[in-house]
Structures are given as C-alpha cells and as structure tokens.
C-alpha cells in the first residue's frame, strides 16, 4: 500500500 508494491502489503498482512 502506498509506495510499497502489492507483494509487500500481501506479505505484511500475512505475517502480521
């Protein structure tokens, strides 16, 4: 989300 690509958001959501 934001300046980060979709993969980062997906990873963060998964690890969070």
Swiss-Prot record:
Gene Ontology molecular-function annotations: prunasin beta-glucosidase activity
Q: How is it modified after translation?
A: Glycosylated.
Enzyme Commission code: 3.2.1.118
Entry annotated with the keyword Glycoprotein? yes
Q: Which reaction does it catalyse?
A: (R)-prunasin + H2O = mandelonitrile + D-glucose
Which keywords does the record carry? Glycoprotein, Glycosidase, Hydrolase
Please give the subunit comment from the record: Homodimer.
What is the recorded name of this protein? Prunasin beta-glucosidase 2A
Recorded source organism is Prunus serotina (Black cherry)
